[in-house]
Amino acid sequence: MGDKGTRVFKKASPNGKLTVYLGKRDFVDHIDLVEPVDGVVLVDPEYLKERRVYVTLTCAFRYGREDLDVLGLTFRKDLFVANVQSFPPAPEDKKPLTRLQERLIKKLGEHAYPFTFEIPPNLPCSVTLQPGPEDTGKACGVDYEVKAFCAENLEEKIHKRNSVRLVIRKVQYAPERPGPQPTAETTRQFLMSDKPLHLEASLDKEIYYHGEPISVNVHVTNNTNKTVKKIKISVRQYADICLFNTAQYKCPVAMEEADDTVAPSSTFCKVYTLTPFLANNREKRGLALDGKLKHEDTNLASSTLLREGANREILGIIVSYKVKVKLVVSRGGLLGDLASSDVAVELPFTLMHPKPKEEPPHREVPEHETPVDTNLIELDTNDDDIVFEDFARQRLKGMKDDKEEEEDGTGSPRLNDR
């Protein structure tokens, strides 16, 4: 796409009177700052009349089913709401135009009005909690929505057909500098044994990309008279839900149970490999996933990188991962095969996407090379090299689009059902 022009996403209101243009759908959180949300809204002047053009950005945490939103009680908490009066521009909302806004206004004309939002760095990233097989409607989790509409004031009731709603994502990418190599060790002294059992485990690195195998090096020194009967390795996802109070949910996303034994007065060393995949965890209701924009496949939620001193109460969902290594040790004696004792260590690590490579500068498109793509709408190819793509979700078989979801948002899971 980089050699065809600057891609701009657009979405129109159902009545066709407003259209919002954004340069991207993913906005990167760099820990100390977040990329601004900048775009323009194109309004039919005959429809606008004497009203004003407003754009809002909302970060919300939905934690229950929409069909239970009755009597003014909703299972949704707005973590952040910002409003901009795009036209006529309010003095406090007027900001210098970005390069994208300048180009869009030049192309779209005088009825295109700019808007810019600054996202606070301590807000959560977009996370979806995996629904169960029978769940329908909007999934629980944290999402960001841009909404544009015309009204006399912000309190006026806005109908869906007269407004534009776009779901965007706040994302983080793996840091360029990894942390120290995760290692952990423990020593256990047993009754009736003069010497201890020592377990040491390590990972080959601290940062893993989604889909990358995790190598776990396990070293056991068994100086006891006990036998290690089994070694269990698991990758666990931890999701801290910070809402009215803080609760932690853990879920194994990859496991291996090896029948490797370690006899008394012996040592053992082996490298185990596990790869956490969402495909192997489809049935796990409430598993944290990266936020979705379309009905396309996603992945396990990325680890959350926190800024020092961040207010954890405002962070909706904090995701982390650990590898757990557990030795199942026979106690010996008459109950040796029936009773056992566990020795375990945990290794925290980071699971994320790598930072995308910077796109090369866009080249001008010669007239004879005008690209043809039925999925894109391109205007004035030779003028300013901008390509417009519909923002709406792709409709797949058995899936609902945005409008259907909003009108039939039932059956999504509640946190208490996890």
UniProtKB/Swiss-Prot annotation:
Q: Name one Pfam family in it.
A: Arrestin_N
Record Gene3D superfamilies = 2.60.40.640, 2.60.40.840
SUPFAM superfamilies xref list = E set domains (SSF81296)
Amino acids binding 1D-myo-inositol hexakisphosphate: 250, 255, 324, 326
The segments labelled Interaction with SRC in the record are: 1-163
Annotated Gene Ontology cellular components are:
clathrin coat of coated pit; cytoplasm; cytoplasmic vesicle; cytosol; nucleus; plasma membrane; pseudopodium
Identify the tissues in which this protein is expressed: Beta-arrestin 1A is found in cortex, cerebellum, striatum, pineal gland, retina and heart. Beta-arrestin 1B is found in spleen, lung, pituitary and kidney.
Q: Which UniProt keywords apply?
A: Cell membrane, Cell projection, Coated pit, Cytoplasm, Cytoplasmic vesicle, Membrane, Nucleus, Phosphoprotein, Protein transport, Signal transduction inhibitor, Transcription, Transcription regulation, Transport, Ubl conjugation
Annotated region Interaction with TRAF6: where? 318-418
Kindly list the positions at which Phosphotyrosine occurs in this protein: 47
Mutation effect (residue 157 to Q): Impairs InsP6-binding and oligomerization
Outcome recorded upon mutating residue 326 to Q: Impairs InsP6-binding and oligomerization
Maturation and modification: Constitutively phosphorylated at Ser-412 in the cytoplasm. At the plasma membrane, is rapidly dephosphorylated, a process that is required for clathrin binding and ADRB2 endocytosis but not for ADRB2 binding and desensitization. Once internalized, is rephosphorylated.
Spans annotated as Interaction with CHRM2: 45-86
Supply one GO molecular-function term: G protein-coupled receptor binding
* Cited SMART domains: Arrestin_C
Q: Which residues carry this modification: Phosphoserine?
A: 412
Positions with biased composition (Basic and acidic residues): 355-371
**Region spans: Disordered:** 353-375, 397-418
User: InterPro entries from the xrefs?
Assistant: Arrestin (IPR000698), Arrestin-like_C (IPR014752), Arrestin-like_N (IPR011021), Arrestin_C-like (IPR011022), Arrestin_CS (IPR017864), Arrestin_N (IPR014753), Ig_E-set (IPR014756)
Q: What is known of its domains?
A: The [DE]-X(1,2)-F-X-X-[FL]-X-X-X-R motif mediates interaction the AP-2 complex subunit AP2B1. Binding to phosphorylated GPCRs induces a conformationanl change that exposes the motif to the surface.
Q: How does it assemble?
A: Monomer. Homodimer. Homooligomer; the self-association is mediated by InsP6-binding. Heterooligomer with ARRB2; the association is mediated by InsP6-binding. Interacts with ADRB2 (phosphorylated). Interacts with CHRM2 (phosphorylated). Interacts with LHCGR. Interacts with CYTH2 and CASR. Interacts with AP2B1 (dephosphorylated at 'Tyr-737'); phosphorylation of AP2B1 at 'Tyr-737' disrupts the interaction. Interacts (dephosphorylated at Ser-412) with CLTC. Interacts with CCR2 and GRK2. Interacts with CRR5. Interacts with PTAFR (phosphorylated on serine residues). Interacts with CLTC and MAP2K3.
- Name listed for the protein in its UniProt record: Beta-arrestin-1
